[in-house]
Amino acid sequence: MKRISDFIAEELAAAFEAAGYDRNYAKVTLSNRPDLCEYQCNGAMAGAKAYHKAPIMIAQDVVAKLEGSGCFCDVQAVNPGFINLKLDERFVADYLDEMETDEDLGLNKTDKPKMIVIDYGGPNVAKPLHVGHLRSAIIGESVKRIARKMGHNVLGDIHLGDWGYQMGLIITELKERKPELPYFDENFKGEYPAEAPFTISELEEIYPTASGKAKEDEEYRERALHATYLLQNGHKGYTAIWNHIMHVSVNDLKKNYANLNVDFDLWKGESDAQAYIPDMIERLKKEGFAHVDDGALVIDVQEESDTKEIPPCMVQKSDGASLYGTTDLATLVQRVEDYHPDKVIYVVDKRQELHFVQVFRAAKKTGIVPSETELKFLGFGTMNGKDGKPFKTREGGVMRLENLIAEIQEEMYKKITDNRTVEEEEAKNTAKTVGMAAIKYGDLSNQASKDYVFDVDRFTSFEGNTGPYILYTIVRIKSILNKYQEEGKAVTGLKVNQQSGESEKALMLALVKYNEMMENAYEELAPHKICAYIYDLANAFNHFYHETKILAEENEAKKQGYIALLILTKRVLESCIDVLGFEAPERM
C-alpha cells in the first residue's frame, strides 16, 4: 500500500505536468502551518527561475489543474508561491479503511529483502548485567524488530565477551580455591564432571575477586595470563572449565534478557572468531595489506579526505597476541562466510566510534567484507542519573540491571495499587508489563546517540511522554471496545466515518502517517521516531475521546465509524509498541 504522501505527490505531479511544468517540482511536505492545511508544495518557487515566471503564477496554474481532485477538499495558491493542500475527508477515511483491511496496516514493505546482521548486547560472560548493558540490548532489539517489520531478513547476534584475560582470572582463582578439582590435574585421563564446580552467584563473585588480586599481586597476574595462554592453546582441563563457565553464564544471561523481552538469534562470541584468525593474518601479510610497525602488525586506514588522524588498525601485538580489532575482523570473516549479509549494524557505545571506523575501513580495504556490504555504526549515548553522571546505586556503585528492573516494577506496583483494590497477582503482572514499558520507552524515546537522564519518577508517570501513558491509552481503547461488544455488537467490517469534528480529523491524520513513519524509522535506525509518533497519536486519541461521546452516540452509523477508528488506533499503537519491545496489559 502506498504512503499517503505518495498519493498526494502523484496527484500534484500530474497537475504540474498538465499545466506545462516539470513533474519533478511536485515535492510534497507536511505543512509548517497545520492551522491552514495538512500538506504543502513549494515546487512553484523552485521552478520560477527555469520558467522565467513569478512563483505565484506557476502555483495558480497548478491549482487550476487540481480542480475536482479526489485527494483534496481545498487547494490554494498563496504568496509568494506556496500551494496549500487540505485533504478530502472521504479520501482520508478510505485510506484508513484500506489500512484496516491489511494485516500489515498498509505498511509499504520492501520487495527486495536484505540480509541484515545486528551486533548488539555484547556482555562479558561470568559478570552480571548492569545498567550499562541496557541501551545496546533494547536499542538493538528495536532496530531488529523494525527491520523485520519492513520485510528484511535479520539475525541478532549477542557477540559475547567470552575469550581472553577474564577467563584466565577465573581459572586461576578457581584453582586457588579448589586445587583438588580434576581440571587442574595434568595426569587426569577420565571424563570431566558434567556439573559445573560453581553456581552463577559464585561465578559472579569469583571474577571481581580475581581481578582485584591481579591488580595488587604481579605473580597472581602472571599466573592468570599463563592460564589464559593455556586455555587459548587448547588445555583440556581449562577448556572444560571454560565450557562450564559458558553454560552457567549463558543460561543466566538468557533468563535476564528474557526479562527484558530481548531475544537473540545467535549466541556467538569472541571465541567463535578465533578459528578464523590464523588464516586471516596470513592472508593480510601475504597480500601486503598488513605491515609491521614498532613490532606490531597493522593495517593503514588513513584516507586523503580525513581532516584528522585515523590511527592504523592493529591486528597483532608484538608478542603475537590478538586484540579487539583482530577479533572484530575475524568475526566479519565468519559472518560474510556464513550469512552473506547485505548490511551489518553494530549497536555499541558511541565512544567506540574510532575503533569501528578503523575496523570498517580495514575490512573494506582488505576485501574481508565485499564493497557492496554496508557496515553501519549505531553509537548510543550514556544513561545518566539526575545528577547528570552515569546512573549509579544510592551508594554510588554500579547498579545491576535486574535491580533496576525490580525498582521500576516496585514503583509501578505502588502506583497501580494506590487508592484502589486490585488482586495481588494481577497487580504484580501489570506492574511487570507497565514497568517494562516505562524502562524501554524512557530510553528509546531519546535519540540513540544522545545522553539522557533516567528519571524513575518521570518514566513511571501515567501522564506525559512516557510508556505508562501510551499503555494507559491502549487500555482505555480496549475498555471501550469491550463495552461495545458487551452490547452484543460486532467489531468487524466497520467503516471509518468522514470526520465530523476537529479532534476526529486530527486522529485520522495522525493514523495516515503510520506507513511513512515506520519506513523513516527503519531508514534512519531511529526507534525514537516511533516513540514520538505514538505519543502524538495517543494525544490525538485522548483529545478525541474527551470531546466525543463514543458509546453514547445515538446515530448507530456514526458510532460504528467511531469504533472503526478506535480499532485502527489500537492496532497501530500495538504494532508500534511491539517493535519497541513491550506490550499492553488488558487492564490498568
Give the residues covered by each predicted segment.
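Short, charged, solvent-exposed linker or helix-capping segments at domain edges/interfaces
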Residues: D94-M99
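Non-catalytic interaction-recognition regions
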Residues: M1-A93, T110-M588
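Short, charged beta->alpha transition segments
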Residues: T101-T110
